[in-house]
Amino acid sequence: MENKNEFIIDILKECSALLEGHFLLSSGRHSDKYCQCAKLLQYPDKAEKVLKVVVDKIKDLDFDMVVGPAMGGIIVAYELGRQLKKPNIFTERQEGVMTLRRGFEIQKGKKVIITEDVVTTGKSSLEVAKLIEKLGGEVVAICSIVDRRDDNIELPYNLYSSVKIDVKSYEEKDCPLCKEGLEYIKPGSRNIK
C-alpha cells in the first residue's frame, strides 16, 4: 500500500496539486497543506491513473450511479462513471442547500456512490447523502482522490480513496499558523464566512 501511496503522491506533486502554506479549508478548519485536486484533474491521463486505484477498490460493489457535489466531485464522478460504465450526475448548492438541478434525478431504490476530490470532514458528502436518502436512494459508499481526515473523524459510510494523506488541520482558535500571524489563503469552493 505504501508504494501505491507514494505513486499517487508523486503524481499529485508533479501536477502541483499538493500545496504548502496557511490555508482555510472548505470545512472551516486551517491547515499548513492543501490538496488542490483541480490541478490533477486538468490532466485526463493522470486523473485516469489516480482514480483507477479507487475503481479497483469499488468495482465489485453493487451500485447504479455515481453522484458528485459541485465543484470538486464533478470530474471525479465523471471519471469513475466512465471507467465503471455507470451514469454520473452532480449536485450543486442553491441558496446554500445541496440540490439536484439540470434535470438530474435519483430514482427511488437506486444505489449510489458519492464522489469527492478531497475528504477532510466529509461534510459535503454527508449533505449529498442526506439528499440521496431524501429522494429514496441508497448510499453505498463515498469515494475520493484524497482522504485527509483526522483520525477522530469517522463517516457512516465506507470511504474508498486513491491515497490517505495525514495532514494536520486545526480549528481557527487552535491554529499555530494564526498564532504566528500568518495570513491564510482560502482556496476551497464552499462559501465560508
UniProtKB/Swiss-Prot annotation:
SUPFAM superfamilies: PRTase-like (SSF53271). Its EC number is 2.4.2.10. Orotate binds at residues 120, 148. It catalyses: orotidine 5'-phosphate + diphosphate = orotate + 5-phospho-alpha-D-ribose 1-diphosphate. 5-phospho-alpha-D-ribose 1-diphosphate binds at residues 116-124. Belongs to the purine/pyrimidine phosphoribosyltransferase family. PyrE subfamily. Homodimer. It is an enzyme of class 2 (transferase). Pathway: Pyrimidine metabolism; UMP biosynthesis via de novo pathway; UMP from orotate: step 1/2. GO terms for biological process: 'de novo' UMP biosynthetic process; pyrimidine nucleobase biosynthetic process. This is Orotate phosphoribosyltransferase. Catalyzes the transfer of a ribosyl phosphate group from 5-phosphoribose 1-diphosphate to orotate, leading to the formation of orotidine monophosphate (OMP). Its cofactor is Mg(2+). It comes from the Bacteria. Keywords: Glycosyltransferase, Magnesium, Pyrimidine biosynthesis, Transferase. The gene is pyrE. InterPro entries: OPRT, Orotate_PRibTrfase_bac, PRibTrfase_dom, PRTase-like. One of its GO terms (molecular function) is orotate phosphoribosyltransferase activity. The keyword Secreted does not apply. It holds the Pfam family Pribosyltran.
